[in-house]
Amino acid sequence: MAHKKAGGSSRNGRDSKGKRLGIKAFGGEVVIPGNIIARQRGTTWHPGLNVGMGTDHTLFAKIEGRVTFQAKANGRTFVSVLPIAEAAE
């Protein structure tokens, strides 16, 4: 009796979904407390003034204001939220 060995399965076909990382609020945009500014793996961007960092390195706004990015001499980029000047009443 002639036999043929069973064919092996393909070794490709494992591709993970995108994780939707990146900047969610760009420089100059107005944010409110709790708004996510950036989702990242590790600290591509560091938290500056009025910005918090979650356990997964997500940066979020602590106050209402305008998002700014500052590049420091040590090569790090800091994200801050500066309060919007209130209109005189």
UniProtKB/Swiss-Prot annotation:
<dbReference type="GO" id="GO:0003735">
    <property type="term" value="F:structural constituent of ribosome"/>
</dbReference>
<keyword id="KW-0689">Ribosomal protein</keyword>
<dbReference type="Pfam" id="PF01016">
    <property type="entry name" value="Ribosomal_L27"/>
</dbReference>
<dbReference type="InterPro" id="IPR018261">
    <property type="entry name" value="Ribosomal_bL27_CS"/>
</dbReference>
<keyword id="KW-0687">Ribonucleoprotein</keyword>
<dbReference type="InterPro" id="IPR001684">
    <property type="entry name" value="Ribosomal_bL27"/>
</dbReference>
<dbReference type="GO" id="GO:0022625">
    <property type="term" value="C:cytosolic large ribosomal subunit"/>
</dbReference>
<feature type="region of interest" description="Disordered">
    <location>
        <begin position="1"/>
        <end position="21"/>
    </location>
</feature>
<dbReference type="GO" id="GO:0006412">
    <property type="term" value="P:translation"/>
</dbReference>
<protein>
    <recommendedName>
        <fullName>Large ribosomal subunit protein bL27</fullName>
    </recommendedName>
</protein>
<comment type="similarity">
    <text>Belongs to the bacterial ribosomal protein bL27 family.</text>
</comment>
